Amino acid sequence: MSEAEARPTNFIRQIIDEDLASGKHTTVHTRFPPEPNGYLHIGHAKSICLNFGIAQDYKGQCNLRFDDTNPVKEDIEYVDSIKNDVEWLGFHWSGNVRYSSDYFDQLHAYAIELINKGLAYVDELTPEQIREYRGTLTKPGKNSPYRDRSVEENLPLFEKMRTGGFEEGKACLRAKIDMASPFIVMRDPVLYRIKFAEHHQTGNKWCIYPMYDFTHCISDALEGITHSLCTLEFQDNRRLYDWVLDNITIPVHPRQYEFSRLNLEYTVMSKRKLNLLVTDKHVEGWDDPRMPTISGLRRRGYTAASIREFCKRIGVTKQDNTIEMASLESCIREDLNENAPRAMAVIDPVKLVIENYQGEGEMVTMPNHPNKPEMGSRQVPFSGEIWIDRADFREEANKQYKRLVLGKEVRLRNAYVIKAERVEKDAEGNITTIFCTYDADTLSKDPADGRKVKGVIHWVSAAHALPVEIRLYDRLFSVPNPGAADDFLSVINPESLVIKQGFAEPSLKDAVAGKAFQFEREGYFCLDSRHSTAEKPVFNRTVGLRDTWAKVGE
């Protein structure tokens, strides 16, 4: 497959191909412009993969630019987190990290240019009055009484704003466009507002800050962006994007193109709702493994490759749609099935004693991956007392049950065939110990007499077991579209986190955060980066071996 054939195809790439073929552009320059007021989520990953991926494929450039125009909500913590997420996903920005605040002097000069052209004015309506005057989708707006101020009036008033002569909310700079426009965004939008807040990049130099719609297009032009890619909610804003660039003296006029944002089942993407989950302690933080944040997915065990593959599969369109959670889960499941070494862990343990087993124990050889001999093998201790999962034993069962049953045989993974002889129970009737016998001639081979033993279960030697905490993470919400609920918090899945105390094979004591394993017959797990200790490792379930929600949705 050629490089061109391997590239994804979508309407944006078709536009770029046409622009390059026609000579409109000789190179491609994109940007990823997050606001540093929160953590990136899987929706941002789509934009990252699109913008950086296009730059890679066309041998162009992609800038990382922080839209840092609201110092009240922004923090250097988010700047650092976003940079880390972009790099973790496997991308590298062109040149230095950029900030919209780098252009505050130029933006201020362009605002003065608009004032001098009679295209901007200082308004002293209150924010509430501005909203009232703006009108609705069915009702046109009305002009502010300050709209017809002269250039000679507006220039000193704007300077008064800049030097702190107005209180917050007492004045703003607005574009002078059309209060009767069918597009509300064009009804004299605010260009600058007053905020007495220290900025994480510029300190206290400024007390006026430009709005996103004024900043975004000028920053694109100053950086030579050729294709400014936004999600569909900014479609109407394109008119303002073009209006600003058409009315200032700037040599470059980028074009904005919109694509559908990512909507994913069983979660929410709204920053406000995600923040509520964190602040109300429904989750333990922005990196909670149930969160759709990149940091949460990473802590859960998702790989950068699986997220890139997911973004590739869902594609880029102009049609809003909701993606099944199963699509994301299948990407990580396929990745880890191929690449994760195998290990054994018992999540709900019950003791099993092999009464005729002689000696202290032995080592059995196990492949690290059943289909990849190049991944090698490991030695796992075996002994006469082991832990098995409680779900792998029944006193009575039908023929469909292929695990251990009283009076019947089963194979222990890569070890011996055993037969359940009797059980011991506590006062409440719970099985505490299963007593078995084993066939000593069946170590990793079939019984000599030819009898068939169909079931295979995993196990951990009790004498060598590593005590572990196992966190069974599941979907955070119990309905596909929690955002549509009257109270999205009311549909949080009460089983989204189940904590178990289990045992694992001793090799897992050397596990490191970010390294995934398939716990045989259980699912894919990784060491938790926050709660694990040397004395008590904590493993997070990344995803099960199969989609257990499939039947729920039918």
Swiss-Prot record:
Species the sequence originates in: Shigella dysenteriae serotype 1 (strain Sd197)
Assembly and binders: Monomer.
Any single biological process term in GO: glutamyl-tRNA aminoacylation
Binding site for ATP: 35-37, 41-47, 231, 261-262, 269-271
Name of the protein in its database record: Glutamine--tRNA ligase
Matching NCBIfam families: glnS (TIGR00440), PRK14703.1 (NF011291)
EC number from the UniProt entry: 6.1.1.18
Any one GO molecular-function label of the UniProt entry: glutamine-tRNA ligase activity
